[in-house]
């Protein structure tokens, strides 16, 4: 990957050629790193493997500390490469052991995301973001109130895992405190497909974090064509933000349903399972909101949908349900369902032989619970105003020219 470097003319008439931008090695999976070492550095493939382990196993970002690399190779790395990880703005522990990091992406202060670690009975799950903000406008999600800013790079996605694993003292293949990763943070992962898939490759690589495919879960609101593409490029676990089992209600909660209604979504999920013997189920997430989608009829609709899905895949428990009590945030019109309603909803599903779990709320005292992540993204009105000012400034400069 050769970058074109464009010279600039200075006021005194001299020409200055800027230095080529260095390659952030955190942006590369194993294949990309091998290619970079061969094409740019002229080095053997095993050298790329050594560096990958230094970065992801030992959390070393200074080439001079990579002691099994020769001096000449370290010099070439300094010239052509760097390892840039997200900056930790703050980290905040919860009373229940949950831990949240606010990570700065870039230098303008407007691009920050949140990453959450949830320990629970011998496992540790990291909730990772894929975008700064989100553009899908799900009406019950805090992130949606901030609008969409941009996609995260591969380095910014896997960098969240790096920051958390380093903080936790995680040692891949030995001392595992980070056992699962869920792409359920800020953003819609399938709208940042290439960067997310590349980052998940590092998560699952033995030279990276060594997680089994079933321990990496991608959660989507239902981009049908991208689910089909994911089926051909990755074997991770799939979760779907369903939240309603009829189109009219789901459209009011998840506007994407207008483009990809439930029938199309369920068909794509069935294709995903049929695409590999390694995949045996899809998790359907259902956030329970008081008086909105928590009534017995809603539970019966969901039970029917899960039975239809099992029949389509020809496998029992192909569809699993994860009930999520709604987590309130400032300005929302929704309320959490009561414990009685939650248990009654679950009982209807269990009686219909639908495998159903209720997700215990974690980290709500630090706004780290499901649906509460929003980072420090400029709100949409301010961002649109800034964009208009930028356009006006450009127009003034064009007129002056």
Swiss-Prot record:
Q: Which CDD domains match?
A: Radical_SAM
- Which sites are catalytic? 114, 370
State its Enzyme Commission number(s).
2.1.1.192
List where in the cell it is found: Cytoplasm
| Record's cofactor remark | Binds 1 [4Fe-4S] cluster. The cluster is coordinated with 3 cysteines and an exchangeable S-adenosyl-L-methionine.
Which cofactor names does the annotation list? [4Fe-4S] cluster
State where S-adenosyl-L-methionine binds: 187-188, 219, 241-243, 327
A family per Pfam: Radical_SAM
What would you give as a GO molecular function for this chain, any one? Answer: 4 iron, 4 sulfur cluster binding
User: Where along this sequence does the record place binding of [4Fe-4S] cluster?
Assistant: 134, 138, 141
| EC category | transferase
Cellular compartments per GO CC:
cytoplasm
Q: What is its main location?
A: cytoplasm
Q: Which cysteines are joined by disulfide bonds?
A: 127-370
Which key words are in the record?
A: 4Fe-4S, Cytoplasm, Disulfide bond, Iron, Iron-sulfur, Metal-binding, Methyltransferase, rRNA processing, S-adenosyl-L-methionine, Transferase, tRNA processing
> Superkingdom, according to UniProt?
Bacteria
Keyword Disulfide bond in the entry? The reply is yes
Name any Gene Ontology BP term: rRNA base methylation
- Where does the record place the Radical SAM core domain? 120-365
Q: Which PROSITE patterns match?
A: RADICAL_SAM
- Function recorded in the entry: Specifically methylates position 2 of adenine 2503 in 23S rRNA and position 2 of adenine 37 in tRNAs. m2A2503 modification seems to play a crucial role in the proofreading step occurring at the peptidyl transferase center and thus would serve to optimize ribosomal fidelity.
Family according to the record: Belongs to the radical SAM superfamily. RlmN family.
HAMAP family reported in the protein's UniProt record: RNA_methyltr_RlmN (MF_01849)
Additional notes on this entry: Reaction proceeds by a ping-pong mechanism involving intermediate methylation of a conserved cysteine residue.
Protein name listed in UniProt: Dual-specificity RNA methyltransferase RlmN
Q: Which organism is it from?
A: Xanthomonas axonopodis pv. citri (strain 306)
């Amino acid at each position: 990957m050769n970058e074109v470097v464009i010279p600039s003319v200075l006021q005194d008439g001299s020409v200055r050629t800027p230095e080529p931008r260095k390659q952030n090695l955190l942006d590369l999976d194993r294949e990309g790193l091998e290619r970079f070492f061969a094409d740019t550095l002229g080095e053997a493939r095993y050298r790329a493997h050594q560096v990958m382990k230094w970065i992801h196993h030992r959390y070393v970002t200074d080439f001079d500390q990579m002691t099994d690399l020769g001096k000449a190779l370290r010099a070439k790395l300094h010239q052509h490469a760097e390892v840039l990880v997200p900056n930790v703005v703050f980290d905040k522990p919860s009373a229940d052991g949950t831990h949240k990091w606010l990570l700065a992406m870039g230098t303008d202060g407007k691009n920050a995301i949140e990453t959450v670690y949830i320990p629970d009975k011998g496992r540790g799950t990291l909730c990772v973001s894929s975008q700064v903000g989100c553009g899908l406008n799900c009406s019950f999600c805090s992130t949606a109130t901030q609008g969409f800013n941009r996609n995260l790079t591969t380095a910014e996605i896997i960098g969240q895992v790096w920051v958390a694993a380093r903080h936790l003292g995680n040692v891949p293949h030995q001392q595992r405190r980070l056992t699962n990763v869920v792409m359920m943070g800020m953003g819609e992962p399938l709208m940042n497909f290439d960067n997310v898939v590349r980052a998940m490759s590092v998560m699952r690589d033995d030279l990276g974090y060594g997680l089994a495919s079933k321990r990496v879960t991608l959660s989507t609101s239902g981009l049908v064509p991208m689910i089909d593409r994911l089926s051909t490029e990755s074997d991770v676990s799939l979760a779907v933000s369903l939240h309603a089992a009829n189109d009219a209600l789901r459209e009011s909660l998840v506007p994407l349903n207008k483009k990809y209604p439930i029938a199309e979504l369920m068909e794509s999920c069935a294709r995903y399972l049929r695409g590999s013997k390694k995949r045996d189920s899809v998790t359907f997430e259902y956030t329970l909101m008081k008086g909105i989608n928590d009534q017995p009829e809603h539970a019966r609709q969901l039970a029917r949908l899960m039975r239809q899905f099992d029949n389509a895949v020809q496998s029992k428990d192909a569809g699993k349900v994860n009930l999520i009590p709604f987590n309130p945030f400032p300005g929302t019109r929704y309320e959490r369902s009561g414990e009685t309603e939650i248990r009654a909803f679950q009982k209807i599903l269990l009686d219909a032989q639908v495998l159903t779990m209720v997700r215990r709320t974690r980290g709500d005292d630090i706004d780290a619970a499901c649906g509460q992540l929003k980072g420090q993204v400029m709100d949409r009105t301010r961002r649109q105003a800034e964009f208009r000012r930028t356009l006006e400034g450009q127009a003034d400069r064009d007129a002056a020219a």
